[in-house]
Amino acid sequence: MSGQNNVVGVHYKVGRRIGEGSFGVIFEGTNLLNNQQVAIKFEPRRSDAPQLRDEYRTYKLLAGCTGIPNVYYFGQEGLHNILVIDLLGPSLEDLLDLCGRKFSVKTVAMAAKQMLARVQSIHEKSLVYRDIKPDNFLIGRPNSKNANMIYVVDFGMVKFYRDPVTKQHIPYREKKNLSGTARYMSINTHLGREQSRRDDLEALGHVFMYFLRGSLPWQGLKAATNKQKYERIGEKKQSTPLRELCAGFPEEFYKYMHYARNLAFDATPDYDYLQGLFSKVLERLNTTEDENFDWNLLNNGKGWQSLKSRNAETENQRSSKPPAPKLESKSPALQNHASTQNVVSKRSDYEKPFAEPHLNSASDSAEPNQNSLPNPPTETKATTTVPDRSGLATNQPAPVDVHDSSEERVTREQVQNATKETEAPKKKKSFWASILSCCSGSNEDT
């Protein structure tokens, strides 16, 4: 198809931009074969921290798990890698904004049960997520059968905590660089300890308390450097008693946090016990999982989407005949990737669950047809942006974990029984003119 039609991956038409992150940009798209709406993620092929190939393989490994988006395509278009997945609704962070920066106990308990189930599914596939945050949990599309299902997305930081075949757990290690989002990461992660299932659970607990309280005690801390800021956040987490953190809320949230923080490094969590805690919260409220989340009760019961209808109408008018997407256009509804900040956005091969040697063949390094790419993007090195609500923001090159060069990682061959590769072959020419600039950094305050 011609470049003027904005078609990638043979039959995916690119629409408006709906988000961005340290990897690149996300666009809404349409499968021209069945008119299905999809999300199309772009990242520069020569990025310092390419992740879409690994993310594709993770989606394939998790295929069939409840609350995991379907993945449809991975391939290359000109100067970019692209990944096509299900188009979903807004993130829990977006919905928190709409609900006045706090959720009710009922909503948090219902959301917690779903979020915990998603993390359990990831753990059962021998993976740890390592970047738990509200921005990475999205609800389904409005008016769909799964509109109230909570999905987990963005698997750029996942890692095997055990061999998927032998089930042997990775060894305990220290002196690890931080990986994840400082606001929510576990205390052990701050202390440089290898992450395992317990750390995902503790980070989830921090998210639950963030939803209930509206903020966490370690937000808004200032320091001269990012490193010092992360240290201050870790110190504040350690010095804040759990009773104080959970004060004013049902006892079950304290029990959850106490359980997560006292798990052994290689212990298998009792997910049923944790699910039972939130079931007890709902029982005490004399309610059930009726899917009446706070965001569905907005605007006299019309729901969150009614608050966006005016903006959506404007967007539809602008995109009735969509031109080539432009980076400066923004979606008012889906900014989940624009509001996230990972402490580590670049990983060495041994930190990647499906690591393989970088391709150096002529076909991989060859420049695409410049006739089809009149405006190639400018390549820039990845940086990490750490703003806070006071307006302070600092940029610095994203740190690289250098402490695990001898770590034995799980290879791609070890999971061939779990998933089969169906990646699209590389194309020598792009179907359309490149419309992206290399995005670097993101902007979650810690």
UniProtKB/Swiss-Prot annotation:
Organism for this UniProt entry: Schizosaccharomyces pombe (strain 972 / ATCC 24843) (Fission yeast)
Q: Which InterPro entries match?
A: CK1_Ser-Thr_kinase (IPR050235), Kinase-like_dom_sf (IPR011009), Prot_kinase_dom (IPR000719), Protein_kinase_ATP_BS (IPR017441), Ser/Thr_kinase_AS (IPR008271)
Per the UniProt record, which EC number(s) apply here?
Answer: 2.7.11.1
* Record-level GO cellular component terms: cytoplasm; fungal-type vacuole; nucleus
Q: What does this protein do?
A: Casein kinases are operationally defined by their preferential utilization of acidic proteins such as caseins as substrates.
Annotated positions of the Phosphoserine modification:
S329
Q: What is this protein called?
A: Casein kinase I homolog 1
Broad class of the protein's primary localization: cytoplasm
* SUPFAM superfamilies tied to this protein: Protein kinase-like (PK-like)
Q: Which domain of life is it from?
A: Eukaryota
